């Protein structure tokens, strides 16, 4: 006998929307457009501009053929492009792979190959080790250099050389803020790729989906007791 609770109750656009953190930034940009979202050195970026820049990054990536199933890798410290990548990359349905900035060249090369990296965004702070890794890797991604304007002049390590053909700010500037970004087809679609430490062998890839990322954001907000317009110091 057919179950009446399974008849004519299929999932559709009227009763279901995939969980994804992409809608969090979209709502913040609509609700608090002029509120400061990112503080980095002398920079103050509002939610409106955070959203616009993420869209432009997504647009620029899409113009270079990036889409579902592709991996975009970043080697960045706690800078605005890191945050923009967390939204701009999945807006194209691609997957974000964030490298640990303390890895050596051999492990970076392994991850670039294993992830089949198509685009690599590199902070010049880490260009030396990335250049060494690229010499070891089989992957030949599009390299985009990021030059942090707030990188301390007296930092222990000076900025490295440019190793790519494109500059991050120029790359983003060429994007279109009217880009028609895409919700995930399914909330179980991959949003990011991380790697284990590889203590018993090569690092293992760990895939996160949109639903998991969205729920983790809820959990972190509740666990940290973050009130309205709380300012969070990102140190990890």
Annotate each language-model stretch with its function.
Residues 20, 24-25, 107, 129, ...:
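Hydrophobic alpha-helical segments typical of transmembrane helices
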Residues 72, 89, 120, 190, ...:
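Conserved S/T- and glycine-rich ATP-binding loop of Class I adenylate-forming
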Residues 33, 144-145, 160-195, 202, ...:
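Conserved pre-ATP/AMP-binding loop-to-beta segment of ANL
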Residues 63-64, 91-170:
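Structural core segment of the AMP-binding/adenylate-forming
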Residues 1-18:
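Flexible, non-catalytic linker and terminal segments flanking ANL/adenylate-forming cores
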């Amino acid at each position: 006998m057919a179950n009446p609770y399974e008849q004519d109750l299929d999932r559709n656009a009227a009763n279901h929307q995939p969980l994804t953190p992409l809608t969090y930034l979209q709502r913040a940009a609509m609700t608090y457009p002029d509120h400061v979202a990112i503080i980095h050195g002398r920079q103050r970026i509002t939610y409106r501009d955070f959203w616009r820049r993420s869209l432009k990054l997504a647009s620029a990536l899409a113009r270079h053929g990036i889409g579902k199933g592709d991996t975009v890798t970043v080697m960045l410290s706690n800078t605005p492009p890191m945050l923009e990548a967390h939204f701009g990359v999945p807006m194209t349905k691609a997957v974000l792979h964030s490298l640990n900035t303390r890895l050596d060249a051999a492990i970076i090369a392994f991850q670039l190959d294993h992830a089949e990296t198509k685009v690599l965004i590199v902070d010049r702070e880490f260009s030396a080790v990335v250049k060494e890794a690229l010499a070891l890797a089989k992957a030949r991604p599009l390299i985009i250099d990021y030059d942090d304007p707030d990188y301390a002049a007296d930092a222990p390590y000076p900025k490295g050389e440019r190793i790519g053909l494109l500059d991050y700010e120029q790359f983003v500037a060429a994007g279109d803020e009217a880009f028609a970004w895409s919700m995930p087809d399914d909330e179980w679609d991959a949003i990011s790729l991380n790697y284990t430490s590889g203590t018993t062998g090569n690092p293992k890839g760990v895939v996160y989906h949109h639903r998991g990322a969205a729920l983790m954001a809820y959990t972190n907000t509740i666990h940290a007791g973050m009130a309205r317009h709380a300012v969070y110091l990102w140190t990890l």
